Swiss-Prot record:
The lineage of its organism: Bacteria, Bacillati, Actinomycetota, Actinomycetes, Frankiales. It comes from Frankia alni (strain DSM 45986 / CECT 9034 / ACN14a). GO terms for biological process: L-methionine salvage from methylthioadenosine. This is Enolase-phosphatase E1. It catalyses: 5-methylsulfanyl-2,3-dioxopentyl phosphate + H2O = 1,2-dihydroxy-5-(methylsulfanyl)pent-1-en-3-one + phosphate. NCBIfam families: enolase-ppase, HAD-SF-IA-v3. GO terms for molecular function: 2,3-diketo-5-methylthiopentyl-1-phosphate enolase activity; 2-hydroxy-3-keto-5-methylthiopentenyl-1-phosphate phosphatase activity; acireductone synthase activity; magnesium ion binding. It holds the Pfam family Hydrolase.
Amino acid sequence: MSSPRPSAELALLDIEGTTSPTAAVLSSLFPYARARLGPWVRDHGDDPEVRRIVAEARSLLGEADAPVQRVVAALTRWSDDDRKVAPLKALQGLIWAAGFAAGELTGELFDDVAPALRRWHAAGVRLAVFSSGSVLAQRAWFAATPAGDLTGLFDGYFDIDSAGPKRDPAAYRRIATELAVTPRRAVFLSDVSAELDAASAAGFATVAVLRPGEPHHLAGNHPCVASFAEMAVDAA
């Protein structure tokens, strides 16, 4: 593998498979939320955010008057299918945030991640996250890592609701605009080649993170590493 050393004002990071083991999400977070989808909707039915989630789920179903049990069944099915749909991600985020706050969940990281993030941040590189998981869940994840609360290292958090689909170049342009950085001065790190293609089309530099044991192993035309320790990011 090559050893990329991009110069960038901003390093934008994926989570699952990039900073954190996919298994930590699939075997811990997803089951934790799935078991609580129905109870959460029923117990927090007066919460404005839950009402918004239910309304958006009904819109996706094309059933404006769908009963709550129908909505819960749809959310559960989308969870089982790992659908990247906004109402599911928002509800999972609420449940996960409560789980992190209760000490029942931990934001797992690969061992090389926290030292690299601190090193890049100290060098003057701004950091941000772009994940299909909700912004609320992202913040909770990085606040409760074995390496401590890392949220102070990040300038921004983006999800499919705030930025758009991760395979759409427009999402990366939107993030660059929000953070007031030109795309050519930003680098995106992910384990999914289609996401890297989209970021590249938006003008970002890219690095494929292909870690042993993770499900994605196609770098495409992107420089690649197996660990953050194999690369450096120089402040532009």
